[in-house]
């Protein structure tokens, strides 16, 4: 488990996608996820959904 996923896992479920878009830290986490997990997508939100299906 990489650091980015651990950080995302600590986020409250109520944050969801709107929370990630609203918070600058969410955008940073999305970028880390994109590079660390090798997810190739132009949409950071989609990367978050792919990496954390439980949310």
UniProtKB/Swiss-Prot annotation:
The superkingdom listed in its UniProt entry is: Bacteria
Provide the function of this protein. Overlapping regulatory peptide whose translation enables hokB expression.
Protein known as: Regulatory protein MokB
- Name of the coding gene: mokB
């Amino acid at each position: 488990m990489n650091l980015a996923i651990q950080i995302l896992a600590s986020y409250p479920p109520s944050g969801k996608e709107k929370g990630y878009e609203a918070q600058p830290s969410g955008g940073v986490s999305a970028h880390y996820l994109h590079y660390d997990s090798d997810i190739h997508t132009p949409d950071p939100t989609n990367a978050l959904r792919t990496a954390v299906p439980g949310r």
